[in-house]
Amino acid sequence: MTTTHWIAMLGLIGAATAGDARAQTGTDIFMAPLRQTGRNVTIGAPVNLTHRAGYDNQPSFTPDGAALLYTAIGDKGQADTWTIRVANGATPSRVTNTAIGVYSPTVMPDGQSFSVIRVELDSTQRLWKFPLGGGEPTLVLEPIKPVGYHVWLDANTVCVYVLGRPATLNIVDVRTGNATPIASNIGRALVKVPHHDAVNFVQIVPDSGQWLAEYDVAKRSVRRLGRLPEGADYVAWTPGGALVTAAGSRIYRWNDGVWAEAADLSGAGVRNISRLAISPAGDRLAFVAEDP
């Protein structure tokens, strides 16, 4: 059985498929100060938090913003959840010790558990949860598989990317397991819109590239907002309502239908930025980039 080994010193009471992780070796997690003034977003000098050869990816902040949960693949190819405090010089600590692997750790709305995409012994990928205080995992969605990515909208509702041809986006009531398909041909980015009952995702449009789209839960409607910059796959919101994305070494901010450059981190040796996470206070940006 899988167990968690939660580090009490953290003082804590936010997916990718296995194939995706294996294909993206050689990544580190970086942290940079972030400041939002009106519509402007400023990104400071980044610090490499994980700084090792191998796969360190899928960061998400804890509710207090003091630490990150993330996925790391060890020397034996096993993917597990790790944690690291955001203070400079902090040492990563292992949280799970699994037989095959878990991905995309995200603290759940109840603040008592974190959810993961767990690869089971028969290679099935489903949504599970672990207690933050340590203990055995529990299956969250029994019938829905294979799950690749997920984001929580509230304590009873989760938005999941279900692998397939095409991949589909589904809103699921975890109390009943009832799933409502809302889109297909989607990318890997799933983020909740702050202060709104809505979720952003990437819509892949043939011959037109990747578009940022939004699903309004109350209206049950999808609208396209605009194309992503070339090479961008992920987005993140600040608590103050600024939407950012990244491509190459650059961070961009959404500004009235146009992506405006917020920072060029090439001078810091940052290459191929992918996943993004912003702290609950909006003062830090965590991102994934290639190993230096």
Language-model segments: residues:
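Bacterial N-terminal signal peptides
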Residues: 7-15
